[in-house]
């Protein structure tokens, strides 16, 4: 945590006042509008208290399934600067517009370690590209885990599915492009839906069979061919709400919505599966089971389906959110119900409805609150869907001090209970957890805290598996510097102290840039101010209760309490308080003490629970008892005066208890009017009452104490403190928030504490615990709390409120405890609850009936040696107006704290809905305070006077002198106080009116609900009674009347009915016969006609034919099949068998006859051919012998002729080949020799020239050299590859022929074809000038060289720039003359092209 020196004092002070509910009216916005909004510096991270695990005692008024929201008045603006360490946990969000600045340690380049509250388990290694994915890369259920990857060989998209229990894996393939989104129907569902970039939908059912994952394709819908790939596609399942009667259900909703770029589609999967059995199916072939919604101008980004599937909400990049009424089964088009721009038209990226999907209360409507996000969720807004008003705005911004300020790109997800919103930044290695509170009745919802958890890599996508309550070990609660201090206390209390606090466990599966990881986060949430019952869990699990003896709690015992530990508060040091926190003099500098100063050990927890308390406790134990009145811890740290800041035993109090007693509230309203006025002038109210420095205060003598203060001191002594253990060492109270009359539940017995005890939220305090002696010991402890008391404006307002002249007015003023207890007795007269003891009555009876000498001596010593202002001093940092805090919430907080300890005497309990209206402080607390004050003035004055007479002080003159001096000061300040009182009362009228109206409305609503319940119960009881009476009456009547009635009715029927019936039926029978005959004739004719028409009708005949065909088809088919199988087939088989036998016999006989005839014919044919073959064979034998003789003769002749011819041809060929070889060799040798001789000549010539140059006194000009020698030398340079030297030597000779010799020898492509150009810029300029001097001869060669040389000029060279203009002008002139001389020359085109090039080069250089 950063140093406190960087905190702006005014801003930090204002924030602390807001946390402690100071300068904040309960119902009005007048004071809120007057107070300037101040930013909250992020260096105060960790001051808000986490919410422990609520065990619940049955008194909670919150509805199940909804996190109740305390009535918090949010500021206008707040800035939270995250620190990047484990102290950035549960940072309070206290404003309507909040800016959250990312920490520098969360950047990717940071070397900071990950959070200790995060446990990471690798699942799979894979490299994902770091970018913002609009869809989900991962889907999580209780049984399976699915994430999108790409194949290593071909890059095709796939989905890997892993079993959470067995780690078995499988792959799902068949996608087009990448996987745009994937999601399970719900956590207990095995149905996985995937959507690829082409818009194809896949729905699988996964199952684990014999240790292997089996996937079954349920739905596969393909988009048309050529659909463009788009990553703006999302899958939205209809939310699954489990029924209360079922524990777990794996059935999922059949409705799913698909968001495409320009439209949304809602599909009924059951209808699709009933109409199609094979997959895939083209979307064009589906005619029913889906509906298309269009209405956005740009691509859709998010959506949500209502639980009944009839309303679809869509968010788009055009900035609109629209709600559509949809009916899949009907023909109605989607109807837009509502639309609005939540973020002023910026692209939307988030749409979340805050519904509890774990257990939904039937009385709570869906879609009550809505979270929207824009600009990749850099801005989040909370909306009320009833009034469409923005309840809160959260903005995320980068660290302004970072070198690379990358804007956040956040992925958000809300857990099923709608209590925590989890965010990951794609650009940073961090996770944020924001706590969400809702109040359905008031229509309010807000983010109450944010926690930062550093990771090792950025999270690209994540899926929530579990968000649940857990118990944190002691080492998970305390910071690192406190763990060593807590080891001793842990060893003394055993292993039971290891689980020291309630926490939250969040299990995620996160896709990082390098791997897929199982992430578990354990942290302690923020304390919910309206339900403060952390000690109830302690009682339930460890049976930590008190007996009848009162325990004395020391700070050591409190330090070892295992509950409600909070991040370290010792990080904040030396934070001065503003002027309006305590009315101090300018010389008195307030100091902020660390919690270590308030942790002085006095007794261990075991000693506290075992040993009874004594009536005279020490100051440290008393302060510990007062500081342990509630289990909640401090929400902020503020300053205290120098007189009390140095006392480590001074108690403090949590913010839930900052409502003062009515008397002190009214008095305090005179001094602390508003934060703005007191900050401007801290001493403007009571300048006469502000003393000097604390070390210069004059000790008050006995003469300074009036009778009223003596009575007050005695009253304080008779209050017994009830010790309630503090939660943990980190819950040490703030030094300036000193426990007062409204701190300890029974120490002062204020109005709030009495109400909490009397209303019975927990176990009541035993009557034996409150005795006069114990109250006296508590008062002694209160006296010892302030070793250096000081005066304050509260004292003057307390003593001189009525403003009457004389001492009688001051003597008649009731004390703080009298006002509090008298009011409590009045408010609970009509109740049956046990009330707090009347300290005034007990004091009076003690003094008059049975005075105790020891008590009187103690009281005298305290009264005469202690200033009477010690109690009022404890209230100088609290809110002094009853309307400036929510009274009922504080009563509930105290009741929850007191209810955490068991008691042996049960107390009647009032229903949670009725206690607010019966004796509630909301029913005009000012009227009650005024009436109680007026009623108690005379009685208290008389008792005080009696006490004063009974025990007169010893130093009477000094007391009178001191009273006179104080009376003069009080009279001087009383006038100003009364004026301010009038102004304050006028300003408070509207606030009191609002309180009364709200109380009446609440009472009316409660009475209305109670009346409705009573009417319903009455109607139910009336119905039951009526049914019972009906049954009894029917039974009685049936038993009494049945026998008699049956006999009488039978006799009467026999006598009367037959004659009457016969007489009445005779005319009727005649009429019936006539009408029947008439009707029958008519019906007969009409039936004949209709039957004839019907028989002639084509439709009837067709119908009869179809019916007959349908009827006879089956029997006829069966008959034909039976007849064919039994009759036709056997007969056909027999006939075929006989036929094939006959055919076989005939074929065998015919074949035998044919073979016999063929044999005889072949024999005769053979004999005839043999007879004709004999002469032919003899003739052939003669011809063969003749041919053999001729062949031998011919072979000899041919071989001799061929040999002679071959010899002749070889002789001729060898002669010609010899001649050609000789000629070729001569030519080659001649060429080689000539070249060698030329080289030798050139070498000799060069040697001679070098010798001549060395012998001469001056260099010989190259112009006088022999042209042949120069050519030889140039040729040698060209052969050696020195082109630039060869051209330079030819150009230096100033001989155009020599230049042409070089140009002819070297090809232009060889010179200018190699980059860079080997010729220097001066050589190029000289070559251009000399070649252009005469274009009449060898024009083609010159033009080609000129064109190449001009193109290779370097215009950036200074030499070229200086001479290029003149040379180019000369060349252009020569080209012009060449064209004029011969316009029709074939080279004119090349010359004109070169002229145009030169014109472009020369023109810019001209002036």
Swiss-Prot record:
The gene is Edc4. Residues 609-632, 673-693 have a biased composition (Low complexity). Residues 727-745 have a biased composition (Polar residues). In the process of mRNA degradation, seems to play a role in mRNA decapping. Component of a complex containing DCP2 and DCP1A which functions in decapping of ARE-containing mRNAs. Promotes complex formation between DCP1A and DCP2. Enhances the catalytic activity of DCP2 (in vitro). The modification Phosphothreonine is found at residues 732, 827, 880, 907. Residues 547-566, 604-632, 673-745, 787-817, 875-951 are annotated as: Disordered. Its main location: cytoplasm. Residues 972-1031 form a coiled coil. GO terms for biological process: deadenylation-independent decapping of nuclear-transcribed mRNA. Keywords: Acetylation, Coiled coil, Cytoplasm, Nucleus, Phosphoprotein, Repeat, WD repeat. WD repeats lie at residues 174-214, 230-277, 295-334, 342-393. This is Enhancer of mRNA-decapping protein 4. It holds the Pfam family EDC4_C. Part of a decapping complex consisting of DCP1A, DCP2, EDC3, EDC4 and probably DDX6. Part of a complex consisting of DCP1A, EDC3, EDC4 and DDX6. Part of a complex consisting of DCP1B, EDC3, EDC4 and DDX6. Interacts with DCP2. Interacts with NBDY. Interacts with Tex19.1. Interacts with LSM14A. Interacts with DDX6. It is found in: Cytoplasm, P-body; Nucleus.
């Amino acid at each position: 945590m950063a140093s406190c020196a960087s905190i702006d004092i005014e801003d930090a002070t204002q924030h602390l006042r807001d946390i402690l509910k100071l300068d904040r009216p309960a119902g009005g916005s007048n004071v809120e509008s007057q107070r300037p909004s101040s930013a909250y510096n992020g260096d105060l991270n960790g001051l808000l208290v986490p919410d422990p695990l609520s065990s619940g005692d049955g008194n909670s008024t919150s509805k199940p399934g909804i996190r109740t929201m305390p009535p918090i008045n949010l500021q206008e603006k707040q800035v939270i600067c995250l620190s990047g360490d484990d102290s950035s946990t549960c940072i309070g969000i206290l404003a309507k517009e909040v800016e959250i600045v990312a920490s520098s340690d969360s950047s990717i380049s940071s070397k900071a370690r990950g959070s200790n509250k995060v446990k990471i388990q690798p699942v799979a290694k894979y490299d994902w590209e770091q970018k913002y994915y609009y869809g989900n890369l991962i889907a999580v259920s209780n049984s399976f885990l699915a994430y999108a990857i790409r194949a290593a060989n071909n890059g095709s998209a796939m989905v890997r599915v892993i079993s959470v229990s067995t780690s078995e894996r499988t792959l799902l393939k068949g996608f087009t492009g990448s996987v745009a989104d994937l999601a399970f129907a719900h956590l207990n569902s095995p149905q996985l839906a995937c959507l690829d970039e082409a818009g194809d939908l896949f729905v699988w059912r996964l199952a684990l069979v014999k240790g292997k994952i089996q996937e079954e394709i349920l739905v596969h819908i393909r988009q048309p061919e050529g659909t463009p790939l788009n990553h703006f596609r999302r899958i939205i399942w209809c939310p699954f709400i489990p029924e209360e009667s079922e524990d777990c259900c794996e059935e999922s909703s059949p409705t799913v919505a698909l968001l495409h770029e320009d439209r949304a589609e809602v599909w009924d999967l059951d209808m699709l599966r009933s109409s199609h059995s094979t997959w895939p199916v083209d979307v064009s072939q589906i005619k029913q089971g889906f509906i298309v919604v269009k209405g956005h101008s740009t691509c859709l980004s998010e959506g949500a389906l209502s639980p009944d599937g009839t309303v679809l909400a869509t968010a788009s990049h055009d900035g609109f959110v629209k709600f559509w009424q949809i009916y899949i089964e009907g023909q109605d088009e989607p109807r837009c119900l509502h639309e609005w721009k939540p973020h002023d038209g910026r692209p939307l990226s988030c749409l979340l409805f805050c519904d509890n999907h774990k257990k939904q209360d039937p009385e709570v409507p869906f879609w009550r609150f809505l979270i929207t996000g824009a600009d990749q969720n850099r801005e989040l807004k909370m909306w009320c869907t009833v009034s469409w008003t923005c309840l809160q705005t959260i903005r995320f911004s980068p660290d302004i001090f970072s070198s690379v300020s990358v804007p956040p790109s956040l992925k958000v997800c809300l857990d099923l209970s709608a209590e925590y919103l989890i965010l990951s930044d794609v650009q940073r290695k961090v996770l944020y957890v924001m706590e969400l509170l809702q109040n359905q009745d008031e229509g309010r919802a807000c983010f109450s805290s944010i926690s930062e958890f550093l990771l090792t890599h950025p999270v690209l996508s994540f899926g929530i598996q579990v968000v649940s309550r857990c118990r944190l070990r002691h080492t998970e609660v305390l910071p690192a510097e406190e763990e060593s201090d807590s080891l001793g206390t842990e060893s003394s209390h055993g292993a039971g102290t290891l689980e020291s606090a309630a926490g939250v466990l969040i299990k995620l599966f996160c896709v990082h840039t390098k791997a897929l990881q199982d992430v578990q986060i354990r942290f302690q949430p923020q304390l919910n101010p309206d339900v403060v019952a952390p000690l109830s869990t302690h009682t339930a699990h460890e049976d930590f209760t008190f007996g009848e003896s009162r325990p004395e709690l020391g700070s050591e015992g409190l330090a070892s309490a295992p509950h409600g530990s909070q991040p370290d508060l010792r990080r904040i040091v030396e934070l001065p308080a503003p002027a309006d926190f305590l009315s101090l003099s300018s010389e008195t500098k307030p100091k902020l003490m660390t919690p270590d100063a308030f942790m002085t050990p006095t007794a261990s927890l075991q000693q506290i629970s075992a040993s009874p308390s004594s009536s005279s406790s020490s100051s440290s134990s008393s302060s510990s008892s007062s500081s342990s009145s509630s289990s909640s811890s401090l929400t902020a740290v503020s300053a205290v005066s120098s007189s009390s800041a140095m006392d480590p035993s001074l108690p403090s109090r949590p913010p839930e208890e900052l409502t003062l007693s009515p008397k002190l509230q009214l008095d305090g309203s005179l001094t602390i009017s508003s934060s703005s006025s007191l900050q401007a002038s801290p001493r403007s109210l009571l300048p006469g009452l502000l003393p000097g420095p604390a070390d210069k205060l004059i000790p008050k003598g006995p003469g300074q104490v009036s009778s009223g203060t003596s009575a007050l001191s005695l009253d304080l002594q008779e209050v017994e403190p009830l010790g309630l253990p503090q939660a943990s060492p980190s819950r040490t109270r703030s030094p300036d928030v000193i426990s007062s009359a409204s701190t300890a539940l029974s120490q002062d017995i204020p109005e709030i504490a009495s109400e909490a005890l009397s209303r019975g939220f927990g176990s009541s305090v035993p009557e034996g615990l409150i005795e006069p002696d114990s109250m006296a010991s508590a008062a002694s402890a209160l006296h010892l709390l302030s070793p250096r008391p000081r005066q304050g404006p509260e004292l003057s307002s307390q003593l001189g409120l009525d403003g009457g002249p004389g001492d009688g007015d001051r003597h008649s003023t009731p004390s703080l405890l009298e006002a509090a207890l008298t009011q409590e007795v009045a408010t609970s007269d009509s109740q049956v609850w046990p009330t707090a003891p009347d300290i005034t009555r007990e004091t009076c009876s003690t003094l008059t009936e049975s005075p105790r000498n020891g008590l009187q001596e103690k009281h005298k010593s305290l009264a005469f040696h202690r200033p009477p202002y010690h109690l009022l001093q404890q209230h100088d940092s609290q809110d002094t107006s009853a309307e400036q805090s929510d009274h009922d919430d504080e009563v509930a907080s105290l009741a929850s704290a007191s209810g955490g300890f068991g008691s042996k005497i049960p107390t009647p309990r009032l229903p949670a809905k009725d206690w607010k209206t019966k004796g509630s402080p909301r029913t005009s607390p000012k009227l009650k305070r005024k009436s109680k004050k007026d009623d108690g003035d005379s009685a208290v004055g008389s008792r005080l006077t009696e006490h004063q007479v009974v025990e007169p002080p010893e130093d009477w003159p000094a007391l009178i002198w001191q009273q006179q001096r104080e009376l003069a000061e009080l009279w001087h300040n009383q006038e100003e106080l009364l004026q301010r009182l009038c102004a304050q009362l006028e300003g408070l009228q509207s606030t009191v009116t609002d309180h009364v109206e709200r109380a009446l409305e609440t009472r009316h609503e409660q009475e209305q609900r109670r009346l409705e319940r009573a009417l319903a119960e009455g109607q139910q009881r009336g119905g039951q009674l009526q049914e019972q009476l009906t049954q009894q009456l029917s039974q009685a009547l049936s038993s009494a009347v049945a026998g008699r009635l049956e006999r009488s009715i039978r006799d009467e029927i026999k006598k009367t009915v037959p004659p009457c019936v016969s007489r009445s039926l005779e005319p009727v029978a005649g009429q019936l016969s006539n009408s029947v005959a008439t009707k029958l004739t008519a019906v007969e004719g009409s039936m004949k006609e209709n039957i004839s028409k019907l028989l002639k009708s084509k439709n009837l005949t067709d119908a009869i034919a179809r019916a007959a065909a349908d009827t006879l088809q089956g029997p006829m088919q069966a008959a034909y099949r039976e007849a064919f199988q039994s009759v036709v087939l056997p007969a056909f088989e027999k006939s075929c068998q006989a036929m094939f036998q006959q055919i076989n016999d005939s074929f065998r006989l015919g074949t035998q006859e044919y073979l016999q005839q063929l044999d005889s014919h072949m024999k005769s044919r053979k004999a005839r051919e043999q007879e004709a073959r004999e002469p032919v064979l003899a003739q052939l034998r003669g011809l063969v012998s003749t041919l053999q003789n001729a062949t031998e003769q011919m072979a000899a002749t041919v071989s001799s002729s061929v040999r002679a011819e071959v010899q002749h041809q070889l002789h001729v060929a060898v002669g010609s080949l010899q001649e050609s070889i000789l000629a070729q060799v001569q030519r080659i040798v001649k060429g080689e020799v000539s070249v060698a001789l030329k080289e030798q000549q050139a070498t000799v010539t060069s040697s001679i020239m070098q010798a001549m140059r060395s012998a001469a006194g001056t260099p010989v000009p190259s112009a006088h050299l022999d042209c042949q020698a120069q050519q030889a030398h140039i040729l040698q340079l060209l052969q050696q590859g020195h082109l630039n030297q060869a051209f330079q030597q030819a150009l230096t000779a100033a001989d155009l022929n020599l230049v042409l010799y070089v140009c002819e020898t070297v090809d232009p492509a060889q010179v200018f074809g190699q980059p860079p150009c080997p010729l220097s810029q001066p050589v190029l300029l000289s070559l251009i000038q000399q070649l252009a001097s005469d274009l009449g001869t060898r024009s083609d060669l010159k033009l080609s060289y000129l064109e190449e040389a001009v193109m290779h000029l370097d215009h950036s060279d200074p030499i070229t720039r200086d001479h290029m203009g003149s040379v180019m002008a000369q060349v252009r002139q020569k080209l012009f003359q060449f064209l004029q001389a011969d316009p029709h020359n074939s080279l004119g085109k090349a010359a004109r092209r070169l002229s145009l090039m030169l014109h472009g080069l020369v023109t810019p250089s001209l002036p």
